Amino acid sequence: MSLTSTDIARIANLARLELKAAESERMLTQINGFFALVEKMRAVDTTGIEPLAHPVATVQDITLRLREDRVSEPNQREANQRNAPALEHGLFLVPKVIE
């Protein structure tokens, strides 16, 4: 997959960005370089290779030190929603921003 200058212009427009011609060309080169790298990675045969969770795990035995998941603060929903202009079913009600 590779993008064209038209694709970059369209994406910039959707993101409300104004890109100069040089910036657009630089973005095109960088993004197409990224896609080329992804295609190279996809081409590698990884059959029989165990997924890697952490790169250090390849050279030493590590165990992820995760804390116990426990409540540390009380539920303050009502206090936080006290000044909300609109609520519905216990949730903040906001205007629709995406059509």
Curated annotation (Swiss-Prot):
GO MF annotation terms: asparaginyl-tRNA synthase (glutamine-hydrolyzing) activity; ATP binding; glutaminyl-tRNA synthase (glutamine-hydrolyzing) activity
The protein's name: Aspartyl/glutamyl-tRNA(Asn/Gln) amidotransferase subunit C
BP-aspect Gene Ontology terms: glutaminyl-tRNAGln biosynthesis via transamidation; regulation of translational fidelity; translation
Originating species: Albidiferax ferrireducens (strain ATCC BAA-621 / DSM 15236 / T118)
PANTHER family noted in UniProt: GLUTAMYL-TRNA(GLN) AMIDOTRANSFERASE SUBUNIT C, MITOCHONDRIAL
Keyword Protein biosynthesis: yes
Subunit structure: Heterotrimer of A, B and C subunits.
Keywords tagged on the record: ATP-binding, Ligase, Nucleotide-binding, Protein biosynthesis
Highest taxon of source: Bacteria
EC number, as in UniProt: 6.3.5.-
Broad enzyme group: ligase
Record's function text: Allows the formation of correctly charged Asn-tRNA(Asn) or Gln-tRNA(Gln) through the transamidation of misacylated Asp-tRNA(Asn) or Glu-tRNA(Gln) in organisms which lack either or both of asparaginyl-tRNA or glutaminyl-tRNA synthetases. The reaction takes place in the presence of glutamine and ATP through an activated phospho-Asp-tRNA(Asn) or phospho-Glu-tRNA(Gln).
Signal peptide positions (record): none
Family per record: Belongs to the GatC family.
Family annotation (InterPro entries): Asp/Glu-ADT_sf_sub_c, GatC
Catalytic activity: L-glutamyl-tRNA(Gln) + L-glutamine + ATP + H2O = L-glutaminyl-tRNA(Gln) + L-glutamate + ADP + phosphate + H(+); L-aspartyl-tRNA(Asn) + L-glutamine + ATP + H2O = L-asparaginyl-tRNA(Asn) + L-glutamate + ADP + phosphate + 2 H(+)
